[in-house]
């Protein structure tokens, strides 16, 4: 609403107080990339996106160094790192930043191969949950239809 300069100052202050290199709760920083995109500051948005993705990649490198048993114990955290990268990539796609999307895809691709067993299991679990939700909705519709039918003479 014409207050782009003020918005940019607020974002800069937030980034100063929550520096990506030292602040471990990255999900709170992710929206700032989107805000920079909205302000037309694509370079700043891309910089945040790449920094956040690199933090998730650092986590994946850490898990890569573990044995299989330790990796299995940290499966949730491994998936969380991928979800972080996928959220960031989706935001860049939404803002039509194809160069950053390509860079992010290049960063994550090797780790998708390394952790394919976890990603495949996660995707399969998500598909099962979606199917269960679909069946529940179908049952609810059937129940509602039966209830309406039973009230009609």
List where the protein language model places each region.
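C-terminal luminal/periplasmic domains and tails of membrane-associated envelope-modifying transferases
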Residues: 1-153
